[in-house]
């Protein structure tokens, strides 16, 4: 049975076909090769011309964390995500843990920022959580301006629910009820997947008002960026979401104290959201 899944991360090698039972990966399969490929598989043979070297020593000791579900599940099917323990972490957090204990767990994990600076994620969460103010925001930075960099794109296209779940957990931890997913407009497939994932999560009661019957509510909205490299900087990103020109401003005050619409704001990259989950 043929099944469509999200990107496996080997974008330059596509189209890819993975045979689960045999653990074989085939690369650059064309339409013309479909018939001989199916014939070889039906005869329980390997289609040597396109057999990828996925079991090389380079990959042998690698363990997928952020891309754990990528290329395994259908990103448009919330049931498949749930079947792989999707949203279990969120439900555990909001029903069994206090906000401070969630922050402590992230701090103890040693997770750091994925934008280059390596700032401790848990410390950032703690700072926003302790900031005064009834209204706080969560922003997921899914924009990347480096030419040929598709890290965020592949993450959001292949496993959007994991990004959303990570945002919701962060929202609970810091006391926020609203999150923004900042995605560049040049990623139409990622935008499509994220918007569908948000609707499906709301339909299942895993996002929106009173999640899973608790007092915790969290809403997520997708905001499109114009592809400006400078909007990778936190304050420029905030200005863009607010509808202003994406220009950095002097700091302090830092976004954790005064960010989106002047309120305490937590900003993390999409990779952090998934690892934090």
Regions from the language model: what does each represent?
Residues 1-277:
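Feature of Fe-S/electron-transfer and energy-metabolism proteins
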């Amino acid at each position: 049975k043929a099944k469509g899944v999200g990107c496996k991360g080997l974008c330059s090698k596509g189209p890819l076909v993975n045979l689960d039972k045999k653990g074989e990966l085939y690369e650059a399969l064309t339409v013309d090769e479909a018939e001989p490929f199916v014939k070889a598989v039906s005869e329980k043979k390997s289609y040597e011309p396109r057999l990828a070297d996925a079991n090389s020593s380079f990959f042998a000791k690698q363990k997928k964390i952020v891309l754990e579900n990528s290329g395994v599940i259908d990103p448009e099917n919330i049931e498949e995500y749930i079947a792989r323990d999707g949203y279990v972490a969120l439900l555990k957090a909001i029903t069994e843990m206090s906000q401070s204990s969630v922050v402590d767990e992230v701090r103890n994990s040693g997770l750091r920022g994925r934008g280059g600076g390596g700032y401790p994620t848990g410390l950032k969460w703690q700072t926003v959580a302790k900031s005064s103010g009834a209204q706080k925001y969560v922003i997921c930075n899914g924009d990347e301006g480096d030419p040929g960099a598709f890290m965020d794109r592949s993450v959001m296209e292949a496993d959007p629910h994991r990004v959303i779940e990570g945002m919701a957990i962060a929202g609970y931890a810091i006391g926020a009820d609203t999150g923004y997913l900042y995605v560049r407009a040049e990623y139409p497939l990622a935008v499509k997947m994220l918007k569908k994932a948000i609707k499906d999560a709301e339909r299942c009661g895993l996002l929106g008002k009173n999640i899973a019957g608790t007092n915790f509510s969290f809403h997520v909205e997708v905001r499109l960026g114009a592809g400006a490299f400078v909007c990778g900087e936190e304050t420029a990103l905030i200005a863009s979401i607010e509808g202003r020109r994406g220009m950095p401003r002097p700091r302090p005050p830092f976004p954790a104290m005064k960010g989106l619409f002047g309120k305490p704001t937590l900003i993390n990259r999409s990779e952090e959201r998934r690892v934090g989950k």
